[in-house]
């Protein structure tokens, strides 16, 4: 599949995996929407939607930075409409935005619990919902969720139940929408790269050895 001229709508695209997906697509001449909350520099995490847009264009693509909170339905609707107005369509929806807290049940603050479910599950569902009518107009449409394989082994739930529950809602969106949308020729897939453990957001919530800790606690795609 050639990405030249294709429009990617990427949530959480200001840094990390989302930005890397955008940059790789840009090398093939894609048009990349960077839809994320970070418009101003974060004290601990590098990158904004505007610096990300510069990187996309440097890689050879076209960029459209949009401030987006995936929890806000009006914001999501308007972001999709802005994309259509600017680029004329959407070919690929990448649900990358996610919240993480690798904490036990007693140590999980309910505000953090709610945030993870609002962003991971509801946000993925909401963004997909508004992209689908436009994906139906594409001749090679895809939805890609940054989500793990559904593995019901207790070991994936025990250490950080709230996060696993929230993240698996994204995985269930893959299974459900793949079945729902197959008659519309919209492919729906999940991507769970091992490199996800090296993103700055993950490093904020793990110590003293974030890479090793997450590698031992995340389900693999094998």
Task: Name what the model sees in each region.
Residues 2-87, 100-101:
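Short-chain dehydrogenase/reductase
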């Amino acid at each position: 599949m050639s990405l030249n001229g294709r429009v990617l709508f990427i949530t959480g695209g200001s840094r990390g995996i989302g930005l890397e997906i955008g940059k790789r697509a840009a090398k093939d001449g894609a048009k990349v929407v960077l839809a994320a909350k970070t418009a101003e520099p974060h004290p601990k995490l590098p990158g904004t939607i505007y610096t990300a847009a510069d990187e996309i264009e440097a890689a050879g693509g076209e960029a459209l930075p949009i401030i987006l909170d995936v929890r806000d339905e009006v914001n999501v609707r308007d972001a999709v409409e802005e994309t259509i107005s600017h680029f004329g369509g959407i070919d690929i929806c990448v649900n990358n935005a996610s919240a993480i807290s690798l904490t036990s049940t007693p140590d999980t603050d309910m505000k953090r619990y709610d945030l993870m479910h609002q962003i991971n599950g509801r946000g993925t569902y909401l963004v997909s919902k508004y992209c689908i009518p436009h994906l139906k107009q594409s001749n090679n449409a895809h939805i890609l969720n940054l989500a793990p394989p559904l593995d019901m082994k207790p070991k994936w739930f025990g250490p950080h139940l709230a996060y696993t529950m929230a993240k698996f809602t994204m995985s269930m969106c893959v299974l459900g929408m793949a079945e729902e949308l197959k008659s519309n020729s919209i492919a729906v897939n999940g991507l769970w790269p091992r490199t996800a453990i090296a993103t700055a957001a993950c490093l904020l919530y793990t110590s003293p050895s974030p890479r090793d800790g997450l590698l031992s606690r995340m389900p693999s795609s094998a």
